[in-house]
C-alpha cells in the first residue's frame, strides 16, 4: 500500500441507492445507505430475494441504480465518463459463486488475462500472475487447466485473477457456497491474509453464518431491499435487535430445546421453573459467573444445554439454565448476569411437574 491508498478511509459509500426492475411490484433496492470502511471485511446477509445480489451488481457497475449516490474510492461514479468508470473498475475485483475461468487457458493464463486486456506487456503480466498464484498458495500449479484443479483451487485462481490489476476492493458473491466446509475455511483464511497483507477491502454476500463469524469486521442485514441492521461483528451477532437478524442468527447461537420442553413453556410466570439462555463473550466467557452466583445467593441451578464457539479470535458460549421460579431470585440472577457482562434472556416458564 502507498500513501494514497492509506489516505482513503472509505472504500465505498452508498446513499439512498434504489433500484426497481421493469414489471416488478416492489423495489429490489429501497434507499440503501452504508459506509464501507477501507481495509476492512464486510459481510452482507439476508434471505433470498432481499436484494443482496442486486446491490453487488450496482457496486461493480453491472447494474445502474434508479436513484441515489455511489462513491467508490472517493470518486462519485455518476460524475465519471464511461472510460473513467472502466479505469475505476480495474481497482474493483469480483469473485462469483461460479468462478468462470476460461477452460482453454491455464491457471497462469487466466490470471494474466485482465492485465493483457489493459495492454500490460506479456512478460510483466506473467511475472505478476506468478506472484499472485504464489500468494494464493498455487505455486507449481501455473500450467494446470481449470479441469485439472479442485473447486478450492479454482476459487484461488479466481481470487488471484480478481487481484491481477492491483484491486483495492474485492466483491465476493456467495463465493464459498459450492465448496466443502474445510475448503471454505481455507479460502476464508486466505482472504483474511490478503486483507491483512495487502490492505484489500473485502465485501462479502453470503447466507453462511460460518463465513460471517470467521472473518467479518462489520455485518449488514438486508430485508426487502434495505439494510435493517448494521454494525460491528460482535454488536450484531451477540446483541441483535431486528427480528430478521435474530432469525438469520438462530442456527448459529440457539440450540433447540427438546420439543417436550418447548411445548410446555409458558410465556407468563407459573409455579415451577424459569428457563434462561445465557450468552457469554469476551471476558465473561472466562469467568466463573455461574459458580459465583451459586455462592453468593445459594440458588439451585440446572444446566439443560451448553455450547462453546468463537467469533474470529473471540470465544463465546451459550448456556440454557433452569432454576425454581421466584421473583426475588430471578431479579438477583438477572442483576448478577448483567453485572458480569452476560446477556441473559428468559425463554419461558416450565410448570411444576413438567420435566426439564
Question: What are these model-derived regions, one by one?
Answer:
Residues 60:
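Helix-to-loop junction immediately C-terminal to a conserved catalytic motif
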Amino acid at each position: 500500500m502507498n500513501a494514497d491508498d492509506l489516505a482513503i478511509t472509505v472504500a465505498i459509500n452508498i446513499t439512498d441507492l434504489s433500484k426497481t426492475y421493469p414489471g416488478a411490484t416492489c423495489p429490489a433496492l429501497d434507499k440503501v445507505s452504508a459506509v464501507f470502511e477501507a481495509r476492512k471485511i464486510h459481510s452482507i446477509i439476508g434471505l433470498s430475494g432481499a436484494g443482496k445480489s442486486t446491490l453487488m451488481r450496482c457496486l461493480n457497475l453491472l447494474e445502474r441504480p434508479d436513484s441515489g449516490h455511489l462513491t467508490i474510492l472517493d470518486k462519485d461514479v455518476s460524475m465519471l465518463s464511461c472510460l473513467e468508470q472502466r479505469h475505476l473498475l480495474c481497482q474493483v475485483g469480483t469473485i462469483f459463486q461460479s468462478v468462470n475461468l476460461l477452460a482453454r487457458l491455464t491457471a497462469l493464463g487466466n490470471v494474466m488475462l485482465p492485465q493483457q486486456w489493459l495492454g500490460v506487456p506479456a512478460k510483466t503480466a506473467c511475472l505478476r500472475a506468478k506472484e499472485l498464484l504464489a500468494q494464493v498458495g498455487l505455486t507449481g500449479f501455473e500450467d494446470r487447466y481449470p479441469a485439472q484443479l479442485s473447486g478450492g483451487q479454482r476459487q484461488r485462481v479466481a481470487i488471484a485473477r480478481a487481484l491481477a490489476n492491483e484491486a483495492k476492493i474485492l466483491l465476493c458473491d456467495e463465493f464459498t457456497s459450492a465448496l466443502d466446509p474445510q475448503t471454505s475455511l481455507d479460502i476464508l483464511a486466505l482472504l483474511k491474509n490478503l486483507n491483512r497483507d495487502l490492505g484489500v477491502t473485502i465485501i462479502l454476500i453470503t447466507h453462511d453464518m460460518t463465513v460471517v463469524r470467521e472473518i467479518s469486521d462489520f455485518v449488514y442485514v438486508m430485508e426487502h431491499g434495505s439494510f435493517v441492521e448494521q454494525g460491528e461483528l460482535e454488536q450484531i451477532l451477540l446483541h441483535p435487535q431486528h427480528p430478521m437478524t435474530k432469525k438469520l442468527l438462530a442456527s448459529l447461537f440457539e440450540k433447540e430445546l427438546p420439543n417436550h420442553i418447548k411445548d410446555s413453556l409458558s410465556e407468563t410466570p407459573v409455579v415451577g421453573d424459569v428457563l434462561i439462555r445465557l450468552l457469554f463473550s469476551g471476558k465473561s466467557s472466562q469467568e466463573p459467573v455461574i459458580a459465583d452466583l451459586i455462592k453468593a445467593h445459594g440458588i439451585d441451578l440446572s444446566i439443560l444445554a451448553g455450547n462453546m464457539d468463537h467469533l474470529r479470535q473471540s470465544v463465546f458460549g451459550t448456556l440454557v439454565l433452569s432454576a425454581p421460579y421466584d421473583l426475588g431470585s430471578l431479579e438477583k440472577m438477572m442483576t448478577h448476569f448483567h453485572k458480569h457482562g452476560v446477556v441473559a434472556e428468559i425463554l419461558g416458564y416450565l410448570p411444576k411437574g413438567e420435566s426439564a
